[in-house]
Design a protein with these regions (language model features):
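Non-catalytic, mobile gating and regulatory segments of ester bond hydrolases
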Residues: 1-194
């Protein structure tokens, strides 16, 4: 039986031929655990450029109602393709040539191969990724990361990174036994509205 890396390598049909499905969601969710290069736009930078939904409502200009409504509904998606992100991160190298940060107990070569398989696959390579947000606070015992993907159809897919195997990750997992929501859950609930 194949695994998610096999799927990322072999399922090359485009989304028009085979619509987005659970396995694709798993690929994008797994990708959120990997390193995200600097070329992927950060949510804070996007918000400073376009504002939050609340900011866009306040900036409505009755002299330009059509443009204002478009910006209100859907600001432009700032993103880079998965292929470009892979190139920025790995520079075409067959082995990881950077300090891999987000793999936990996973072999960095496996992480590298997974990223490269997605970037080389026509099904995934053109998907854009943006609005990356990452927070890590040892004092608050919280970690959070999310990235938004833009599919060729125009649909957005939000992928959240769960806790990792760090001490902060373990503490956050234990905190969930008696605290609701933990700070990362509150941030996750706020993320789509930003």
């Amino acid at each position: 039986m194949g695994n998610i890396i096999d799927y990322a390598r072999t399922e090359t049909r485009d989304f028009g031929e085979l619509p987005f499905r659970e396995a694709d969601a798993l690929v994008l969710a797994q990708l959120s655990y990997d390193d995200v290069p600097e070329c992927v736009p950060r949510l804070d930078d996007i918000e400073s450029r376009y504002g939050t939904l609340h900011d866009r409502v306040k900036q409505f200009d009755p002299r330009h109602p059509i443009r204002s409504v478009r910006m209100l509904r859907k600001p432009p998606f700032d993103g880079v393709t998965i292929a470009r992100a892979d190139d920025e991160l790995h520079h075409g190298s067959a082995v990881p040539d950077h300090n891999v940060e987000n793999v936990g107990l996973v072999d960095p070569q496996v992480t590298h191969d997974f990223y490269h398989a997605i970037a080389a696959n026509p099904r995934f390579s053109g998907i854009e990724m943006g609005a990356f947000l990452e927070q890590f606070d040892g004092d608050e015992q919280t970690q959070f990361a999310a990235v938004t993907y833009l599919l060729p159809s125009g649909a957005l897919v939000v992928a959240y990174r769960g806790t990792d195997d760090s001490l902060v990750g373990w503490k956050e997992d234990f905190n969930m036994a008696f605290q609701y929501p933990v700070p990362a859950q509150a941030t996750a609930a706020d993320y789509p509205g930003r």
